Curated annotation (Swiss-Prot):
Keywords: Nucleus, Transcription, Transcription regulation
Any one GO CC term of the record: transcription factor TFIID complex
Gene: TAF4
Family statement: Belongs to the TAF4 family.
Organism the protein comes from: Kluyveromyces lactis (strain ATCC 8585 / CBS 2359 / DSM 70799 / NBRC 1267 / NRRL Y-1140 / WM37)
Stretches for region Disordered: 1-121
InterPro entries linked: TAF4 (IPR045144), TAF4_C (IPR007900)
Protein name per UniProt: Transcription initiation factor TFIID subunit 4
Length: 366
C-alpha cells in the first residue's frame, strides 16, 4: 500500500521498531511532555506506515491447510516436500492440457473432409501406366459378357431325356380324366407332362434307393462281438472233426478188406435237398394248382440222392448220422435286390400299394 501523501517518513530505518511502539502516543515520552503539550505539527507515524514497512507474507501455492498445531522441529524438510509435490502436480496439469490440445487438434484435422482433386489422381495413375477409361471399358464388357452367358445357360435344354415318353403320359392321363368325366387334351400342355414324368422318376428313385439300402443291411449284419463267446464250442468242434476223420478211415479200411459193402439208403436226404423240397411245396400250395407232381411227394418213390454219391466210399452208418452233426449251414441270402427288399420298401408307403404288396407276397419264393 502507498504511504500517506501528507506525511513523509524522514527517520532512518533502524528506528522503525520505536515507531511501531509509539504509533498511538501523543507527544514525546523522552522529553516528558504531557498529552496537552504535544506537537501535532511534527511527523508522527501512522498505522499505515507499519503495514508498509512489514515484509509481505508468502502464501502457499497449492497446498492444503495443515491440522497439526504442534511446531515441527525440522521445518525445512516439510517445506521441501510440499514444494516438490506442488511442482509435480503443476507439471501433470500442464501435460494434461497439452495432451487435450493435441487430441483436439487431431480430431479437428480428422473431421475435416479430405479434398482430393480428380485431375491429380488421374495424372498420378497415368504416370503409373494405368488408363482409367480403358479399365472402365474392359469392366463393362466383361459384365455384359457374363450376363449374356448366364441367360444362354438358363435357356439350355436339359441334357438327359425325360423319364417317361410324353405321348404315353398324355394317353394315360386322358384315359383317367375321361373316367372322371373330364375331357381334355394333354398333348398341348408340355409343362404338365414334364411335371408328371419328373414325379414318376422321383418316386421310382426313392423306392429303388430304399430297396438297395435294405438289401445291404440284409446281407451285412452288425458285428456286435468280433471274438468267440466261449472256448468250449471250439474244443467240441475240433473233437467232432477228429472223430469224423477217424470214422471215415475205419470205414474205408473195412471196405478195402471186403468186410463191409458200400450201400446207400434211398430214404436219406441231405438238408439242402429237404430245404429245396419244402420251398417247392410252399410255392405249389400258394399257386393253388395240382398240375405237376413230383416223385418225392408220392409214397414209395425213390429219390435220386446225388449228394450221397459224390461223398465217396462212405458207409450208410456215417451218412445216417448226418456227418457227425458238424455241418454248419449259413443263411441263404441272395445277392442284389430281391422281392423281399422291394416289398419292404413299399410297405413304408401308405397310398396305392395295397394290391401290389398282396400280389408280391403271393409270388414270393422264399
Amino acid at each position: 500500500m502507498a504511504k500517506s501523501p501528507k506525511r513523509k517518513n524522514s527517520e532512518p530505518e533502524d528506528l522503525s521498531s520505536n515507531k511501531r511502539s509509539k504509533s498511538f502516543e501523543f507527544g514525546k515520552v523522552e522529553n516528558g511532555l504531557e498529552p496537552s503539550g504535544s506537537d501535532f505539527g511534527s511527523d508522527l507515524p501512522t498505522p499505515f506506515d507499519t503495514m508498509v514497512t512489514e515484509q509481505p507474507l508468502a502464501l502457499p501455492k497449492a497446498s492444503s491447510p495443515t491440522t497439526n498445531l504442534a511446531s515441527p522441529r525440522n521445518s525445512s524438510t516439510p517445506n521441501l516436500k510440499t514444494t516438490s509435490t506442488t511442482s509435480k502436480q503443476s507439471q501433470k496439469a500442464e501435460q494434461k492440457k497439452n495432451a487435450g490440445g493435441s487430441t483436439g487438434s487431431t480430431t479437428a484435422s480428422t473431421t475435416k473432409p479430405q479434398q482430393s482433386d480428380p485431375d491429380k489422381l488421374s495424372d498420378a495413375l497415368l504416370s503409373a501406366g494405368v488408363d482409367i477409361r480403358e479399365e472402365e471399358a474392359l469392366l463393362s464388357s466383361t459384365v455384359a459378357r457374363t450376363k449374356a452367358t448366364g441367360i444362354s445357360a438358363n435357356n439350355q435344354v436339359p441334357s438327359h431325356p425325360p423319364f417317361l415318353h410324353p405321348k404315353n403320359i398324355s394317353d394315360f392321363m386322358k384315359r383317367i380324366a375321361s373316367e372322371q368325366n373330364f375331357h381334355q387334351d394333354f398333348n398341348k400342355n408340355t409343362d404338365i407332362l414334364g411335371l408328371m414324368s419328373t414325379a414318376c422318376e422321383l418316386y421310382m428313385r426313392d423306392v429303388i434307393t430304399n430297396s438297395l439300402i435294405l438289401s445291404i443291411h440284409r446281407r451285412k449284419g452288425v458285428k456286435l462281438n468280433t471274438g468267440r463267446r466261449s472256448e468250449v464250442s471250439r474244443s467240441l468242434r475240433d473233437l467232432a472233426l477228429r472223430q469224423k476223420t477217424q470214422e471215415e478211415r475205419r470205414v474205408q479200411r473195412r471196405i478195402a478188406l471186403g468186410l463191409e459193402k458200400q450201400t446207400t439208403d434211398a430214404r436219406l436226404d441231405t438238408e439242402e435237398t429237404q430245404y429245396r423240397a419244402s420251398n417247392a411245396t410252399a410255392n405249389l400250395m400258394i399257386a393253388g394248382g395240382n398240375k405237376k407232381k413230383y416223385s418225392w411227394l408220392t409214397a414209395g418213390s425213390k429219390s435220386s440222392s446225388t449228394d450221397l454219391k459224390n461223398q465217396g466210399n462212405v458207409s450208410s452208418a456215417v451218412a445216417a448220422r448226418g456227418e457227425m452233426g458238424i455241418k454248419y449251414r449259413e443263411a441263404r441270402e441272395e445277392p442284389g435286390i430281391v422281392m423281399r427288399d422291394l416289398l419292404l420298401a413299399l410297405e413304408n408307403r401308405r397310398v396305392g400299394v395295397n394290391n401290389v404288396i398282396t400280389k408280391g407276397y403271393a409270388r414270393i419264393r422264399d
